[in-house]
A protein has these predicted regions:
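Register position in tetratricopeptide repeats
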Residues: 260, 291, 335, 369-370, ...
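Amphipathic alpha-helical scaffolding segments comprising HEAT/armadillo-like alpha-solenoid repeats
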Residues: 200-210, 232-244, 262-273, 296-313, ...
């Protein structure tokens, strides 16, 4: 057992170039940071479960760097012979290199007879089977948490094996063994999932995760990205310190999280990273600042930004045969105001993969913005034939129908999008707004109430409920929604004025 943790990440980064869910940026260079040659996927659905367990085919890196073993300095070659990939010892002997067999390789610890269930990997590294034949173990090496399964729908090793039992049985069995989690409500995964569902009341808790140096860097990066995606006002405060982090992954997440910050302010924040030493960070900065008007910059900044854009286009050009890269180029050119180049990139993405729904949606939006509504609508109908159950496609068709003045068709499309939406609330919220605006305010309030019960703490939903309830004369309910709204961000003076006005009217 190592007395002091290894702080050199070169071995794990070398393995991660193949054993990670990633995109390629450049050629391999020994000793270079992984992010200097690859773009990593964060711990977001649908790639990972809400608690960070593997879900899609994400390989090993993303799960392993979450583990306590990684934080303690364990590296790949401690368990695997790097050339043959054979384990260092058979069975539980791999774990016994560090963990005392008398304490852990015993029925007193694992509560199973010798055989299935008594192997360390059975409980701490459950396998997921891909393509029907490829069993891959989750390398986050975690303790089974049926309590989280009950609230998050995440898997656990107990019911993965005992498929005839449920999570409540597993939870009670662990309690009978004296194992009882006391952090179900406050667990980082639970808090983060609430924010993913639109509950901004937990934004402060997610900000605390971002700042918590005891959490794995990949989890902190994921938390910061989620905070940015949520539109929470705390993102700037959370991201600013990490723009100068010594950990490239955290700098990358900080850049990504600022996408909704006004462009001029964003440039001021990201200006020191125009020449960041790590390529993935520079690529993220380039994409984030693509919309900066060069004529507003001083000469030195404009030249630095143009160099960065040239590098971005050169790197992307090396992978131009990938539809995802063409999609990114479309977004980049669109942000720069170059519609012909953006259209060409989106059409090339569709030539490479005619099933790529995001390219259909982005191209349709570009055509609409250019006054080509009929072409945009035809493209969306084509996307619907490809993906008839896509909520995003139905949502876009609903908005197109509203612009065309066809309220009946718009409500049909938006209702379909709302029915198909997962953890997000956007489609259901817009459907409710459409109900209100097209003459059914009571239906809108019913839809918003149901949404607020399922995903409480969303400011847009609460604001609409406050206003629509007041319109219908339900002043006490409206005042309650406004009060909850203010509790999410007391700094918002417009929300405070609304609360005070509705509270006075309800008296």
């Amino acid at each position: 057992r190592r007395e002091t943790p290894v702080t050199d990440n070169r071995q794990i980064d070398n393995c991660g170039r193949c054993h990670a869910r990633r995109g390629t940026l450049g050629d391999y260079h020994y000793g270079a940071d992984l992010l200097d040659t690859h773009r990593l996927s964060f711990l977001q659905p649908p790639l990972y479960h809400a608690d960070g367990q593997i879900r899609d085919e994400v390989y090993v890196y993303g799960s392993f760097v979450q583990s306590r073993m990684h934080q303690a300095g364990v590296v790949c070659s401690n368990c695997h012979e790097p050339h043959s990939n054979a384990l260092r010892a058979p069975g539980n002997g791999v774990c016994a290199q560090c963990h005392k067999p008398a304490a852990y390789d015993s029925t007193a610890h694992h509560h199973h007879a010798p055989g299935p269930g008594s192997q360390c990997v059975d409980c701490h590294m459950p396998a997921t089977t891909y393509m029907g034949v490829d069993d891959r173990r989750d390398h986050s090496m975690r303790i089974p948490r049926p309590d989280l399964s009950l609230v998050l729908g995440t898997p656990n090793a107990c019911t993965d094996c005992h498929s005839d039992r449920d999570d409540t049985w597993a939870l009670n069995t662990l309690r009978d063994w004296g194992i009882d989690a006391d952090d179900t409500a406050s667990h980082p995964a639970r808090v983060l999932e609430r924010l993913r569902s639109g509950d901004r009341r937990v934004a402060g808790g997610v900000s605390a995760q971002v700042a918590d140096t005891d959490l794995p860097a990949l989890w902190r990066a994921t938390a910061l990205e989620t905070l940015g995606n949520s539109g929470a006002g705390q993102v700037l405060e959370a991201a600013r310190p990490l723009l100068g982090s010594a950990t490239p992954l955290l700098r990358l997440a900080a850049v990504r999280s600022l996408a909704a910050v006004p462009l001029e302010q964003r440039f001021g924040l990201l200006r020191p990273l125009l020449a960041d030493p790590v390529l993935a960070v520079r690529m993220e900065v380039a994409a984030s600042l693509a919309g900066v008007p060069p004529e507003r910059l001083r000469d030195s900044d404009r030249e630095a930004l143009e160099r960065l854009f040239s590098e971005y286009l050169a790197i992307q050009g090396e992978h131009a045969d990938m539809p995802s890269v063409q999609l990114q180029l479309g977004l980049f050119h669109s942000a720069r105001g170059d519609r012909p180049a953006a259209e060409a990139a989106y059409r090339e993405a569709l030539r490479l993969n005619a099933q790529l729904v995001p390219a259909h949606l982005n191209l349709a939006d570009l055509l609409r913005a250019g006054g080509r509504e009929d072409e945009a609508r035809a493209l969306l109908e084509q996307a619907r034939r490809i993906a008839p159950d896509s909520g995003d496609v139905l949502y876009a068709l609903g908005l197109s129908a509203i612009r065309a003045g066809d309220s009946e068709k718009a409500l049909t499309f938006l209702a379909g999008a709302a029915e198909r939406e997962g953890r997000s609330v956007r489609h259901r919220y817009v459907h409710a707004v459409a109900l209100h605006d097209l003459g059914d305010p009571r239906g809108a309030v019913r839809a918003l109430r149901a949404l607020n019960r399922e995903a409480p703490g969303n400011p847009e939903v609460l604001l609409a409920l406050a206003n629509y309830s007041a319109e219908l004369g339900m002043l006490e309910a409206a005042a309650g929604y406004a009060k909850t709204l203010v509790s999410i961000d007391p700094r918002r003076t417009d929300w405070r004025r609304l609360r005070d006005r509705l509270a006075a009217a309800a008296r």
